[in-house]
């Protein structure tokens, strides 16, 4: 079953065992999967958006790697790593297969192509030229660069950012649609605000849950935790390059409730002896106890009778066996069991 | 995995197990007790050389919470252990197994606590070095702590006794 879980150890026995480190670096330290919507912390460590948000809301306000203080608002997208993961994971299976096949056959030595100084020079020159053009291109088309809105963190072209801010982050107006409508018809997902348990009323949280189409049952604590997890799941989804549908996120929330929350609630309630007045308890449940005692007596009696019967049969059997064999060990065993039964 | 999609905890533990068996640390063996439930592991730890625990082979269990790796597992020796940092019921008291925030003995700095970047092999290695170097500042077994501080000879004697017991001698 282990072969279908890709992990860095797959590279260990291959010719490219160094790729183990590459593989490891592209994985989140929390879930050990390739980064999904990687976010970089203020201290420079990268985690999946969902993993780090969950950790910072539920466990500790410190970076898991270096223990420096850390807040969700400090997290930023790590776009380069996201692209890197995308390309590496797309090629991973192929590289692994090729490398493992190659391990079976001797690899022909790689011969460096001879390089002439002239060619080298030419290459370098053309390289410089290309860099320059790129630079000017970037300058000209700076309006096409995607920038993050400082208010709602939506990504939009530089040209649209001012209008976006003027409209209070609301681009759904007739004019605002032109930069959106050309490529995608879906509007960009927006992050939602966390609620503060100290300042937010329960009714408000209930309404928010209702607005999102989520369950509003449970105690105050449950409602707050549910909304908190919803915010975590939702905001992590917004960080995703290809966000999943709302119903998918709802499924995730449901799964979280059935595994994590249900398990916490399943812990046995501690019953302290102080809470119980034992005389009252005995009186209240006298009938039940009487019934149980009677049942227990009956079953003991029944077992005894059965065992006695068995013993009698065994004794007879043993008698025959002993007659036939001289080995008297089974006889000793029998007397041991007999002794045990007298006690019970 | 009970028919459903494995949870984050299950998935991560599968990976840890796979990595563990591909590159096992010396003197330690560990794995899920049952391949359908990755939340309970059994492990065997060899007593480190040049310590009273030398030559011993100590069985223990690791119980992982549903929200692993956000919260740490609980480690419990299933044989008799005499050690300042192991409770009499076998539960190991070591900073790497304490989540930041709960500090039963008020002495641990946040940097040596549990964090999701830790893993099973790191826990077991820490436990092994804990066997070699008890920390008498955090007494889980007060008697053993005192004995270790005041009467090393007697301490070694008792430990050797538990080692023989664990080996079934």
From Swiss-Prot, chain A:
A zinc finger (RING-type) spans 28-67. It catalyses: S-ubiquitinyl-[E2 ubiquitin-conjugating enzyme]-L-cysteine + [acceptor protein]-L-lysine = [E2 ubiquitin-conjugating enzyme]-L-cysteine + N(6)-ubiquitinyl-[acceptor protein]-L-lysine. Transmembrane segments: none annotated. Signal peptide: none annotated. It comes from Yarrowia lipolytica (strain CLIB 122 / E 150) (Yeast). The keyword Transmembrane helix does not apply. E3 RING-finger protein, member of the UBC2/RAD6 epistasis group. Associates to the E2 ubiquitin conjugating enzyme UBC2/RAD6 to form the UBC2-RAD18 ubiquitin ligase complex involved in postreplicative repair (PRR) of damaged DNA. It is an enzyme of class 2 (transferase). Pathway: Protein modification; protein ubiquitination. This is Postreplication repair E3 ubiquitin-protein ligase RAD18. One of its GO terms (cellular component) is nucleus. Interacts with E2 UBC2, forming a complex with ubiquitin ligase activity. GO terms for molecular function: single-stranded DNA binding; ubiquitin protein ligase activity; zinc ion binding. The gene is RAD18. It is found in: Nucleus. The lineage of its organism: Eukaryota, Fungi, Dikarya, Ascomycota, Saccharomycotina. Its main location: nucleus. GO terms for biological process: postreplication repair; protein monoubiquitination.
